[in-house]
């Protein structure tokens, strides 16, 4: 069995363009150390990834997002780095890494964020209180998503059993079924139907009721919490990183030092 976290993680969304399947994907991404999001064009993959990263940020979880091509990575970075709160760009701590050029752009971006937050005043206790307000709602949403996941599994099992019974009915003249086999399948179908009825239908609206709808307050949280993380780069423990960021070395050497710093797991 895959390793998983059992904690109920608050889901934090920057928009409401989302459905139950996407919420389930975000919820599962928080429970497992690795998530793979796939689907045909137009199914909301990019939006799901963005909201997964924002949810991870809200829960103090670091994310490495990778793709087989640059387009989704660039799209996600563009969206996360251009979020605004009351006309001001949110200094969201996200980096677009890659070749030498991309790493140089990342270094420049970090320094721009450092300058942006320099004079900001942040009241951590207020931010923490707003976060605590979401915990109970998160537990209820997590329980509802667990039921939705069970419904999907039950319906899949019911469909498989239905196909099997139809096949056996079609082949009844060429194969002989023992009476207890038919009875067992009928019992299994009844059991599946009973459990599906017990859980009931779960709609997108049901899940959305358990999400925080105060968008302005959430963007305020993102703005000041992001700024708090960026301001933390001025603390003594980040001296090595600051020396790299403030260095006048050639781009090649600067990128080499930055990459070496980022390779250490304790630095990310």
What kind of feature is each model-predicted range?
Residues 1-17, 151, 168-268:
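Conserved helicase NTPase catalytic core signature
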Residues 1-31, 103-122, 127, 255-258:
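Pre-P-loop entry segment of helicase/translocase ATPase cores
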Residues 32-52:
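Walker A/P-loop
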Residues 65:
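Conserved SAM-binding loop
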């Amino acid at each position: 069995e895959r390793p998983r976290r059992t904690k109920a993680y608050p889901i934090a969304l920057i928009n409401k363009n989302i459905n139950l399947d996407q919420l389930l994907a975000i919820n599962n991404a928080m429970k497992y150390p690795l998530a793979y999001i796939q689907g045909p064009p137009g199914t909301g993959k990019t939006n799901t990834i963005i909201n997964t990263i924002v949810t991870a940020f809200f829960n103090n979880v670091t994310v490495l997002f990778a793709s087989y091509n640059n387009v989704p990575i660039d799209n996600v970075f563009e969206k996360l780095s251009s979020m605004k709160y009351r006309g001001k760009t949110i200094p969201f701590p996200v980096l677009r890494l890659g070749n030498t050029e991309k790493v140089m752009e990342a270094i420049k971006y970090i320094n721009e964020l450092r300058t942006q937050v320099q004079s900001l005043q942040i009241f951590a206790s207020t931010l923490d209180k707003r976060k605590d307000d979401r915990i109970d709602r998160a537990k209820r949403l997590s329980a509802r998503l667990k039921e939705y996941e069970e419904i999907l599994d039950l319906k899949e099992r019911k469909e498989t059993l239905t196909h099997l019974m139809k096949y056996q009915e079609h082949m009844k003249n060429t194969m002989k079924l023992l009476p207890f086999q038919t009875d067992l399948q009928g019992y299994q179908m009844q059991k599946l139907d009973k459990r599906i009825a017990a859980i009931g239908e779960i709609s997108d609206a049901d899940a959305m009721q358990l999400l925080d709808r105060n968008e302005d307050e959430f963007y305020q949280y993102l703005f000041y919490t992001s700024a708090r993380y960026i301001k933390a780069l001025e603390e003594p423990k980040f001296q090595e990183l600051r020396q790299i960021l403030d260095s006048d070395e050639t781009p090649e050497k600067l990128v080499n030092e930055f990459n070496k710093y980022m390779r250490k797991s304790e630095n990310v």
